[in-house]
Amino acid sequence: MGKIENNERVILNVGGTRHETYRSTLKTLPGTRLALLASSEPQGDCLTAAGDKLQPLPPPLSPPPRPPPLSPVPSGCFEGGAGNCSSHGGNGSDHPGGGREFFFDRHPGVFAYVLNYYRTGKLHCPADVCGPLFEEELAFWGIDETDVEPCCWMTYRQHRDAEEALDIFETPDLIGGDPGDDEDLGGKRLGIEDAAGLGGPDGKSGRWRKLQPRMWALFEDPYSSRAARFIAFASLFFILVSITTFCLETHEAFNIVKNKTEPVINGTSAVLQYEIETDPALTYVEGVCVVWFTFEFLVRIVFSPNKLEFIKNLLNIIDFVAILPFYLEVGLSGLSSKAAKDVLGFLRVVRFVRILRIFKLTRHFVGLRVLGHTLRASTNEFLLLIIFLALGVLIFATMIYYAERVGAQPNDPSASEHTQFKNIPIGFWWAVVTMTTLGYGDMYPQTWSGMLVGALCALAGVLTIAMPVPVIVNNFGMYYSLAMAKQKLPRKRKKHIPPAPLASSPTFCKTELNMACNSTQSDTCLGKENRLLEHNRSVLSGDDSTGSEPPLSPPERLPIRRSSTRDKNRRGETCFLLTTGDYTCASDGGIRKGYEKSRSLNNIAGLAGNALRLSPVTSPYNSPCPLRRSRSPIPSIL
């Protein structure tokens, strides 16, 4: 019995942390990575994430020496960033306890929650782990994210809201240094495609591609350079001057009254006509501001990477509408016809659009952008507040109308002598003023019943307004903290990653460290493996690498394999599958209590030919070179 129990035990070494459990525990979630691992033989074949079948690894010709205790555990197969997995002991088990040990190069802290899900049937999200990391680990272990318990779902979803908010507050990713880095990154950030060779013999296209992102950042991004900051301060100065001029034009000290009476020939009487004209000094100041706004608008539209998006922008529309009336007014001021005067009167009314230039400050102040995004994100809360107020206004306006009529005098049936609430629509105004705690005092109840209704209306208004306000404040705090964090992020520089050598290259297996490349097991040399590993890591991390060597052909992209005649005798069992095929639940692997609502289990349990659909964290990765296969005495199971 002890031997059978030891054979049923499995030791999972995840990132150096060992976890011990039973195979039956791992089989409680069929179709997941650990369930398929527990159901298959250790000597079974391995399937990659793309479904390619790997040849199993034969044991070495001679027993290799064990690594020292402080040396890292040799890695297993490395497929597209899926993680490393190794099985200790070959056919047998070299663990003193008798159980088999498998190594996964994954996050050990998250795996504790994953293993607890196999044991209890409840998947909880750790509060001290970043959301994308936990999401990636769930995808690796083959667990559906919808299995997360409701108590942890908000914690799990927080990272997605944060990522969406961070995408809103864009900051420049360029720094000084290599000029090529700025040009390439600036072109990508502005949406300008990198089209080498478009520049003609005279190089006009090349100069335009260099000038366009710089000029656009100069007028659009005040944090890109010192010159951009100077432009931003100048724009801010003219905005404030224009708004100040607009306000001073309404003051009587800057208004000049002129007599426009025209004598009529053979007329018996004359009608005096007066017009109010603005002080010419304010007109000149406004003209200087309009010239600056016109210059800024033309430069931005010329160097805009996307003209259509520029025209559709609300702030740009406000700029155009605020600039156009000034030129029309100057052009029509010399005309004396009645139609021209009517148009001038209309243009003077339209000039109030200039006050909307204050919204241009959102380009320069993060706090204003945060406020705008907060109002946009709190639309549901504002709608809820309006509904609550509308219900309260309707209820209390009706109550105050009938409450005031209760105390009416017998000789005043309409109650118009002792109260101002003559009808319910008039009570709407009183209810709004009372619920918002303004209390103008123009309308107030005069009977004891009306006073009671007024007190209830004031209390209900305080509670109604106070309920959605904390949600709006929390949204503002979240957006503001994320905006500040986005601004303090270190600026990125484009890194140069050397290309991986081709198999046909004379330097394919050479290393500067003079490492030995003589392998009796048809292994690749360590120098080549290190170089390929660096290249694979750079590609997986999202860095771009350029090279003059042609891409690999499809056969060359296949992982490096070991050839052995023993492969024919291996059983065709899998270690990990992304498609279940004709997989069915094991006869002895019943569903435990607590797993009935598991979507990971319901997607495949008892079904044949259905696919295990996992939401990938990243897009499928096609390696431009053979992936790393290290020399290890431990046979790979993944």
From Swiss-Prot:
GO terms for biological process: action potential; cellular response to ammonium ion; cellular response to nitric oxide; cellular response to toxic substance; globus pallidus development; membrane hyperpolarization; monoatomic ion transmembrane transport; nitric oxide-cGMP-mediated signaling. InterPro entries: BTB/POZ_dom (IPR000210), Ion_trans_dom (IPR005821), K_chnl_volt-dep_Kv (IPR003968), K_chnl_volt-dep_Kv3 (IPR003974), SKP1/BTB/POZ_sf (IPR011333), T1-type_BTB (IPR003131), VG_K_chnl (IPR028325), Volt_channel_dom_sf (IPR027359). It is found in: Cell membrane; Membrane; Perikaryon; Cell projection, Axon. Residues 56-72 have a biased composition (Pro residues). Pfam families: BTB_2, Ion_trans. GO terms for molecular function: delayed rectifier potassium channel activity; metal ion binding; transmembrane transporter binding; voltage-gated monoatomic ion channel activity involved in regulation of presynaptic membrane potential; voltage-gated potassium channel activity. Zn(2+) binds at H124, C130, C151, C152. Glycans are attached at N259, N266. Phosphorylated by PKA in cortical synaptosomes. cAMP-dependent phosphorylation inhibits channel activity. Histamine H2 receptor- and PKA-induced phosphorylation extends action potential spike duration, reduces action potential spike amplitude, sustains maximum firing frequency in hippocampal interneurons; also reduces the incidence of high-frequency oscillations in hippocampal CA3 pyramidal cell layers. Expressed in neurons of the visual cortex during postnatal development. Expressed in neurons of the globus pallidus at postnatal age day 7 (P7), onward. Expressed in thalamic relay neurons. Expressed in neurons in layer IV and deeper cortical layers of the neocortex. Expressed in hippocampal interneurons. Expressed in nonpyramidal interneurons in the basolateral amygdala. Expressed in retinal ganglion cells (at protein level). Widely expressed in the brain. Expressed in numerous thalamic relay neurons throughout the dorsal thalamus. This is Voltage-gated potassium channel KCNC2. It comes from Rattus norvegicus (Rat). The gene is Kcnc2.
